[in-house]
Amino acid sequence: YMIVIPAKNRAFNIKCDDGDSMKLETLQKLVGGPIEPVHTLLEPGWAREKDVDGILLLVNEEGRLKGLPENPRAEEMVSYAAPAHAKLVGPAIVAAGRGEEIIGFAKPVAETICAEWL
C-alpha cells in the first residue's frame, strides 16, 4: 500500500498495482504529472521492511508551475533540511525508498503512518 495525501481532502491508502510497487503511469496519474521524490522526516524503520533507505513523498514535479494548491499535511512530513521543498503543492504519495526502487508498505504499516502523521 501507498498513502495518498490530497491537498484538500483526507489521506487514504491505495493498494499497489505492480507487486510491492506501483506502475509509473499510476503514480503520475495520482499526482497529476511527472513525479519527483522528496525525503521525509520519517526514519526508514517506519517501513518495517528490510533494506529501506528512507520514506519518500512523491509529488508533481511541475506542481508549482501549474499553480496546484498547497499541501500543508505533506509539508509537515518533509525534512526542513530541504528548503527547496518548503512549500509542497498538489497531491503527494507516501512510499518507501529501497535503492532505486519505490515500494509500498504492508497495510498495517500504511494505516499506522496515516494514524500517526495524517
List the model feature ranges, each with a label.
Residues 1-118:
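Short beta-rich binding modules
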